Amino acid sequence: MHVRRAAARWHNGSVSVFQSFRDIFTLRDDPSDRALDMPSRLEAPHGFARISLRPVREDDQEDWNDVRWANRDWLMPWESGDPLGGRPLSFNEWVRRMRQDEQAGVGAVFLIEYQMQIVGQVSLGAISYGAMRTGMVGYWVSQRYAGHGFAPLAVAMLADWAFRDPSGPHLHRIEIAILPENHRSKRVAAKLGLTDEGLRRSYMYVNGEWRDHESYSLLAGDVPGSVTDRLVPRG
């Protein structure tokens, strides 16, 4: 009798696990239903630095290139890449790829603007649905504006959009992977109250080599209100 009960528990548990994987990898609905309704602009809440987030456009190429070139040494230690050395996308190809990702509901990239100038970028990628509903967050801010609180505010705004905004993907969890020596980025995670989930070995190819990353997560259930409420307004 005890053997039968144990077998039944194992069977039910296995079905649950296998069902979860089927939910993840099987499209049970029309993929077009997952298309992200990208907002034209997300504004910082009143009382915070007056940054805004907006999707990248093809006519941003010159300004985006200028900011990236001016910050090339500042950003290089943290740049991820393709270990197989694939051909880099042109700017317009990159924008078209973003539009495809938005339509598929698997990614969204926003420019960070301050006083009508591009000062950085924040993105939500590798979005999974089904039993997981999770996504990876990435960001960078121009060295000129480091220390102004733009990065944590931009990540908080993105998280609020991803968790609860009607136009967002309604995720359960977001994750940030951070190089152990990237103390500025770890302060962003700390300011937002993300949970340190430990080290992931050789997790991402960065600046020419596979690197360990520390994983930080935030759940929609961790935040009863707005993620930006976790920050102190800076005006």
Regions found by a protein language model. Give the residues of each.
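Generic, well-ordered alpha-helical segments
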Residues: V56, V67, P83-S90, A104
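Conserved GNAT-fold acetyl-CoA-binding loop/helix
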Residues: M76-R96
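Acyl-donor (CoA/ACP) binding surface of acyl/acetyltransferases
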Residues: H2-D63, V67-W74, V109-G235
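A short helix-loop-beta-strand connector motif used in the catalytic cores of GNAT acetyltransferases and
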Residues: P83-G85, R96-L111
